[in-house]
Regions:
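Short linear motifs embedded in intrinsically disordered, proline/glycine-rich low-complexity segments
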Residues: 1-204
Length: 204
């Protein structure tokens, strides 16, 4: 860190590792380092070192290629970290997945009709992802397949494109097909987790 851009140009005592914890943002595209005094450093989802914003640090002054000062944005970032910790606590709770599943399936039952087959396409990796089949009916000569679980986690990188992400951050995907359902459903094994694997979002 350049001397002019740190609060401790002569160095400071080593941090106690037992007092440090990393908190990932819900989207998975940012992380905060927290100690007993609060935020120590944050690399948010909109940080891009190549564009001159490497992240924020409590010990930084002004802006440098290594870190921007955290003091001026602490009020904006701290609620995000609090939300993130609450989100991961919720995700670890035993009923979290069931609540997402129940909400999505109830919506599909009301809007499309009764379910058929149900597949796990997450391969054991988060976020948990299922596919629900709605077989053809007398008035609908095609099958509707829908993901179940994507909406349980916000998609990454929306903060780079819009100020209010609330209407775009959570999605489920669906398709209509006349192909055998178990063949068509395979696309969701790849595309369902794509936003978190590729650190992007659907809706560009």
């Amino acid at each position: 860190m350049p001397e002019a851009h740190t609060k401790h140009p002569r160095g400071r005592p080593r941090f106690d590792p037992s007092c440090l914890r990393a908190v990932w943002f819900e989207e998975g595209d940012g992380v905060a380092l927290v100690d007993e005094e609060g935020l120590l450093a944050v690399i948010p989802g909109w940080a891009e070192a190549d564009s001159g914003l490497p992240g924020y640090a409590r010990e930084a002054i002004g802006r440098s290629a290594y870190a921007w000062e955290l003091d001026s944005v602490r009020g904006q970032l701290w609620p995000r970290v609090v939300h993130a910790e609450a989100y991961w606590d919720w995700r670890r709770a035993s009923g979290a997945w069931r609540s997402v599943q129940r909400t999505v399936l109830s919506h599909l039952n009301r809007q499309i009709g009764e379910a058929g087959h149900y597949w796990d396409v997450s391969d054991g990796h988060p976020p948990l992802l299922r596919v629900s089949e709605r077989p053809p009916t007398e008035g609908r000569p095609f099958t509707v397949l829908s993901t179940v679980g994507m909406c349980g986690q916000r998609m990454p990188t929306l903060d780079r494109y819009m100020a209010n992400t609330s209407q775009h951050a959570r999605v489920e995907l669906a398709l209509a097909t006349t192909l055998p359902a178990h063949h068509a459903a395979r696309i969701f094994r790849w595309i369902g987790a794509f936003p978190w694997r590729a650190v992007t979002w659907f809706g560009h």
